[in-house]
Amino acid sequence: MKKYFVIALASLSIISCNRQLTTALKSSDKDFILNTANEFYAQKKWSNAIALYDRLPNLVAGTDDAPEVVFKLAYANYYDKNYRLAGHQFKNFAGTFLNDPRREEASYMAAICYYQDAADYNLDQTSTESAINMLQDFLNNHPNSDKERAEDANKKIDELTQRLETKYYEQARRYFRMADYRAAVTAFENLLEDYPSTKLRQKSFEHIMKAKYELGMHSIYDLKKDRLESAIAFSKDVERDYPDTNSSKEAASMREKLLKELDRHLKVIEENEKRKAEFLEKQREEELKKREKEEEEK
């Protein structure tokens, strides 16, 4: 019985809210609409509050109520998880109400909305880059912001930056798994250039080492020497930067094989050059004999 009573009360509450919303939406009384919107806002009925706040900007333009309406509309959309729209509204507030004491908060919340809207690392990262820019702009424009807010912004920038690093690392790793070693090397090198302090640096070095090893050991003749020498040089970089690690040991092991392959390849080059020289010499001698014979026949 109690269960049905609770359901009945909930139904009556919904009907009452809907009636209240409908009445306010049909009204042209600014104060009535605003008060009703504020009631829904206080009750955390965000969609109802949004519907009414959306009606108010033109009605309150130029009045003291205007900043409050824009500010609460932005927050209502934020709480309703309409992050992109809320971010635009907070940004608009900060750019419009320059002397409002909540301007810094609005700038901060605009950045937070972009942060909330940022995609997972395996999706397009345009929103993530926008969020980083917004958070950095907030720090630049509000250097005297309270410590907690500044620390939170920096923390979120680090988090989003790591998300980008992971995105580009996984892209590079995908090239590596596909055995597209040239593309893998380029992608890992771009990652290290763009994010020199990345926590994925050592793993990137390991993949570059392996990719260069594969390129050198299985290269075509004309490119083999340069690729072997490049892999050998990089193995030394790995040992220098990560001494006494598995990465260093693996690089040393690869270098030993690379040096043997380079030595073998240099001998092949030497032999080919020798044969080429012999062929050219023989060709020259034959040409000389041909000319001598032609001279005798004259």
Label each region the model flagged.
Residues 4, 17-298:
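Acidic, polar-rich low-complexity tracts and alpha-helical solenoid repeat scaffolds
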Residues 1-17:
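Sec-dependent bacterial lipoprotein signal peptides
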